[in-house]
Amino acid sequence: MSTSSAPAAIGPYSQAVRVGDLLYTSGQVALDPATGQMISGGIEAQTVRVLENLKAVIEAAGTDLSNVVKTVVFLKNMGDFGAMNAVYGQYLAPNGVVAPARSTVEVARLPKDALVEIEVIARL
């Protein structure tokens, strides 16, 4: 599945794949959907863009962020964990909503030198 409301894939992969009643997204980095370029700004700005990209992908599949059951977060620097969490919580655990299961790992490098990449599994 694919939507123009999120950045086009930068490799041979799909934005998301449906398997039964689950949607598996590819990881999203902070690319502007209109230009395909990395946005400027720090971890907070990049996390917002990543989550907006993911929101566009899962909404195109007919679901929304409230149906996300699992995420994997890749950080270039674990020192950004707190700042990323502050933004992440606004999208995936607003107003005390139970947050999805999650793994977070630090990696040496991300595509386009992103600071954060997130992938999700959501119910349809």
Name each model-derived stretch.
Residues M1-L124:
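Short, polar/acidic, helix-capping and beta-turn segments at strand->helix junctions
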